[in-house]
Amino acid sequence: MHKLVLIRHGESTWNLENRFTGWTDVDLTPTGIEQAKNAGRLLKAEGYDFDLAYTSVLKRATRTLWHCLDEMDRTWLPVEHSWRLNERHYGALQGLNKADMAKQYGDAQVLVWRRSYDTPPPALEPTDPRCERGDIRYAGLAPEQVPLTECLKDTVARVLPYWNEAIAPTIRSGKRVLIAAHGNSIRALVKYLDGISDQDIVGLNIPNGIPLVYELDAELKPLRSYYLGDAEATAKAAAAVAAQGKA
């Protein structure tokens, strides 16, 4: 049996301000830092250890991993960064307040933008200063690989090749893997692992900074999955994520 641990980054500055973040590279809040440290302490207390970690190229996930590994005294672990683990791109909504958008367009429309499987938000213009196509961290990508908007279906399409080509073979080789990523890149992986339908994925919310453990068989099919820590606190944290897009 293999164990895989997924963790969404701790609270970011734009989580706190209830803004659509996407590929915008915002940092953790003091609360987010403490969430990441708590995750590391919890993993250590529960006897977890890792051989390799994966994360995105966005600092809120990277710093979450740093703080988590620091608490585990594992700062020396090899870490692989990939843009494919980035958050879903929220297009022209990036930087805008979710509750304000709900007041303007209605809760139902914002829920579609936030959680539907195949409906992307309005796209950024390539000339928009928020567009990441000139960002040095994506210099090795073709322009069309740097999105102007994404739905979850698009996020799945970029996450799964990385899972299949990099992460899954590492797990099959017997290495213990930790992934620190984002709400929607984790939703993409969970959808794939658990076979969640396009309709049911709308209701899945990933809380910040709480380790999600998957026990996998030899074919990397889930035997079971669970969050570490207090179940009631985890449920409250997931409910808070769900409520972010309401007026």
UniProtKB/Swiss-Prot annotation:
One Pfam family cited in the UniProt record for this chain: His_Phos_1
Residue positions binding substrate: 8-15, 21-22, 60, 87-90, 98, 114-115, 183-184
SUPFAM superfamilies: Phosphoglycerate mutase-like
Entry coiled-coil feature ranges: none
Pathway of action: Carbohydrate degradation; glycolysis; pyruvate from D-glyceraldehyde 3-phosphate: step 3/5
Keywords carried by this UniProt record: Gluconeogenesis, Glycolysis, Isomerase
Active site residues of this protein: 9 (tele-phosphohistidine intermediate), 87 (proton donor/acceptor)
InterPro entries: His_Pase_superF_clade-1 (IPR013078), His_PPase_superfam (IPR029033), PG/BPGM_mutase_AS (IPR001345), Phosphogly_mut1 (IPR005952)
Catalytic activity annotation: (2R)-2-phosphoglycerate = (2R)-3-phosphoglycerate
Recorded superkingdom: Bacteria
GO terms, molecular function: phosphoglycerate mutase activity
Keyword Signal: no
Enzyme Commission numbers on file: 5.4.2.11
Site label Transition state stabilizer, positions: 182
BP GO terms, sorted: gluconeogenesis; glycolytic process
Xref: PANTHER family: PHOSPHOGLYCERATE MUTASE
Role description: Catalyzes the interconversion of 2-phosphoglycerate and 3-phosphoglycerate.
Quaternary structure note: Homodimer.
Protein family (similarity comment): Belongs to the phosphoglycerate mutase family. BPG-dependent PGAM subfamily.
Protein name per UniProt: 2,3-bisphosphoglycerate-dependent phosphoglycerate mutase
